[in-house]
Amino acid sequence: MDSAHCSWFQALFFLALVWFFNCGSVDGVSTTVKVGNFSKVEDAVNFHIYYGQTFKVIKNAVDGQSYLLLQNNSRIASRTKYCTSRIKSFVIPLSNFSADTDSFPVSFLEHLGLLESLKGITSDTVTSPCVLKLYKGGQIEKLNKSDYQMLAQFSAHFFGDTDQQPACNFATSVPFSEDTPLQRAEWIKFIGAFANVESRANQVYTTVKENYLCLAEIAKSRTSFKPTVAWMKYNSGVWSFTKEAYYLKYVEDAGGEILDANKNTYNISDPDDLEELHALLCTVEVVIDETLAYDPVNYTMSTFIQNLNVEDRSCFSFLTNTSLWRYDKRIQSSSLDWYNGAVSQPQLVLADLIEVFFPTGNYTMTYFRNLFKGETPINIGPEMCDRDTSSTLDPTIVPCG
């Protein structure tokens, strides 16, 4: 039996087990509490949602966990509690929760209107103005992610580090396990199921997906040549070119062509490697530098040139075209909104890349900054929260047509 069939069999068996506990013994006349709205997973591959009459089951394919979500006004909620290596139960809608903000995109909560139920975060460098506002106002507390006793006070703790030992109230949300931008964005439905706001999650994802696909179709229809793109990073004397499917999908959908290097890493202390790296960069029109920077504000074009260690740059058309970029335009200290807002709104990333590849000059970038032009990151602060924190944040729709 292959893994897909096995997963379906396990899910059906689990649903049958829960149905037995929920409906197997009835004392007199009972009222049925039904699940109100539904989410269907369309694109993501690492989670699935199954619905019963008074419960839901979310299966996480990354860590093998099944989350049994029990409606708070159902009989089963008061008499059932699971905390095993494979099954955990939660009473929903969650009354409060915390999040490991080093690995969990809080932007999903903003789109769902759940910020005021967020009561704890593990870092105060989160790239959300409204989360920072609530934290500054004392409505959210900062937590030690290793203090399980402190984390246990919440109905759930959302985190994305699969290497961390989970406690009974931990729910693993791992959009970063997905290979495409839309697959990652669809994890809003995972969060929505814990709060009974599937209809809102569906609405947000549909809006984002339609805008993304429209932009991708426009980019595909361009008749001009596809720019060659080097998506690269530097670490300890070695440059490498990305092979990550997530980035490749963005480049493809924006109308670019990723650099096809013979090998993946180039050591600048090796003359042969340096010469080959030099030659390769002479063939590209766009460079996206994703080198990790603990101080993004001071990462400039000079930093890139110094790391490159190439004296003759006369053939670099990406410099002639002023097309040297980083995706750290929006930051909070050393944290990048690329790992928060960009996850829930990939249409904005795609629109940025289309402008990078086919510049018009009349578009304002959201996530990318131009190193050649000396653009610096924008530091996100609580004063930038200009809306009611209890309201839902609508996705930004990029004009497409």
Regions found by a protein language model. Give the residues of each.
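N-terminal ligand-binding lobe of clamshell/alpha-beta domains
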Residues: 2-401
